[in-house]
Amino acid sequence: MAVWAYDLFEIPEDPAADAAFRRFHASVESYWPPERALVTRRYADLLFPFEEISVPPVPMTAAWSLERVLGYLSTWSAVRAFVKATGEDPVAAHAPNLAAAWGDAGAEKTIVWPLVLRAGRIA
């Protein structure tokens, strides 16, 4: 049995862009649905009646431009909830700061999503 999800992405090759993304996330974090906390806590609170299997870290990676990242952020349920609650688009509001930190908007950066995974077998 396994349960998995991916956590917030990181931009390890560019600390300035990563920090700008973290600031963006902080602005919408309270708008995530409550069940998102399971992922944030890496499924630690999930009743898991199986013999745990140790799983090595498995990241997902992609090379994305700033435009692609901004488009992706716009799909988040937290962003949609923010817009519904405030009438404002947080992606548009943060885009100038994200762009300044990113540099060349056409440049692709390596985006890394840590995989959140619990695996086990029936004992």
Write out the residue ranges for each language-model feature.
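Conserved catalytic/acceptor-binding region of the Class I
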Residues: M1-A63
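Conserved Class I S-adenosyl-L-methionine
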Residues: V39-A123
